[in-house]
Amino acid sequence: MDLDEVYKKVHCEPQNPTLDPDKNYEVVEAKDGVDFDLEAAKKSLESAKKGTDVSIPLTYTPADMSTEEYRKMLFRDEMSSYSTEVEGSENRKTNVKLAAQYCDGTILMPGESFSYNLGVGELTEERGFLPGPSYADGQSVMDMGGGICQVSSTMYMACLYANLEIDERHCHPYPSSYVPAGLDATVAWGGCDFVFTNDTDYPIKISTSYDGYSTSCTIWGTITEPFSVELYTETVETEPYETKYELDKSLGKDEQVLDTVGIEGLTVQSYRRVYDGDGNVISDNPEAISVYSKRDEVYKVGKLPKDKDKDKDKDQNKDKSDSSDTDKKTTESESDTQEE
């Protein structure tokens, strides 16, 4: 008998329960570790008389956690939750709803990362997405899936409050209305992404939804040590916008219409401060830097201000000319009178 081969087949380390992603996240039950003293077994076998049985005692080591305990701890705690109010067109709301549906129920094992772009998938009409407002090269445009950044930004906030590791995040060209400046997360299929990692010891579940008024993201997991997170931001730099005028010949010369709302440029530093269950600060670190572009205010006008100034100067010069002619005529009249 080859005891080395027997040992390879019998020996196993204790295994804690886990989830099997390949089997719809079924619970894989805990297993006890099995071992025996290989050298002692060899000596017993060598010294045994031919034809006699040799008993080899096995040692069993239980797993650190039972299957029942594991089931009770799975997704037991709400690690964080964040909601934002959804506004805009029906197309935009449809895109928000779809993005939330595609992400809802995602489970991440310890150490596993989540890509928002891969979670939502390609933004195609076949998958239900519609054209909605978006940004391209700093300009507001209609793009397929416009609006899904609100779900990624809401998820970003939830991940920060759950104290999860952020791997990739980008800010919009301009601050968003639904989250504070410095705390948004823009995405683009085939481009910038929002990615985070489950750096806890247990699986986490992403729960995302849209109820017709707001979109929400809740992170479910297992909190082993109580904590809380405070997020705060600092405006590092500002850049004021300018007011510009564009000629629109369909307007009267004294008419003007606001075409583009001005937005101040901002550079914002965000921070994540983490407390333990007793309120003591565990960490207080910079989170991300966000650079938002300025957008100039634009008015459509029937006549450009410089043209108005020219007309004003012309009118003033005309008034001066008329006044000079009047003075000249008066002087000439007075002169004639004197001569007479």
Feature names for model-found ranges:
Residues 1-340:
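Well-ordered beta-sheet/strand-loop patches within structured domains
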